[in-house]
A protein has these predicted regions:
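Phosphate/pyrophosphate-binding catalytic cores of soluble transferases and nucleic-acid-acting enzymes
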Residues: 1-177
């Protein structure tokens, strides 16, 4: 509601930064704006992709950059809203240039995770990449699997990629509310 109010008052457009609301299938689960709210102000990056497709923070950054540029070109103020800190950080601090991981490797890691469960998978990850200890919780299935697939494919710790390769942040005057 605040975003809609700001969009009307400041001649703006709303751009989604919630990692669940980008998915078509999560309309109800993610409190996506209603049709009546969407009519009140232009909304972008809601229901963008199917959950069946891989969509990373880097993918979101590419999309949001296009939408911000388009909004500014149309003399509109981009108003970025949502709940994913990682997405906001990609805009303000940049994102690590981690090489793409092929779908076969991702599937292999997911299958291993499903077979072993949280704790045993985490223990296996620590053998593969000891640097991860105390940096990623065993219960964080998304990050543990990402760390595993990155180490498996690149032979380099996810933490090394994160520490050494930040780029692509947006150099705009950003106000946070």
């Amino acid at each position: 509601k605040l975003a809609i109010h700001l969009a009307k008052k400041l001649n703006g457009e709303i751009i989604n930064a919630d990692s669940m609301q980008v998915y078509k299938e999560f309309r109800i689960l993610s409190s996506r704006p209603s049709n009546s709210e969407i009519k009140k102000a232009k909304h972008h990056l809601y229901g963008l992709i199917s959950v069946k497709k891989y969509f990373s923070a880097g993918d979101w950054l590419k999309e949001v950059k296009k939408k911000i540029k388009l909004s500014l070109k149309n003399k509109k103020l981009p108003i970025i809203v949502g709940g994913t800190g990682l997405y906001f950080n990609t805009i303000t601090k940049g994102i690590s240039k981690i090489p793409d991981i092929d779908s076969r490797t991702r599937a292999k890691v997911r299958n291993l995770f499903n077979k072993l469960g949280y704790q045993k998978f985490y223990e296996k990850l620590l053998i593969l990449d000891p640097k991860i200890k105390n940096k990623i919780l065993p219960s964080d299935s998304q990050r543990t699997q990402r760390a595993y697939e990155v180490k498996l494919k690149t032979k380099k710790s996810l933490l090394d990629w994160i520490a050494n390769t930040k780029s692509d942040f947006l150099d705009y005057d950003i106000k946070k509310i």
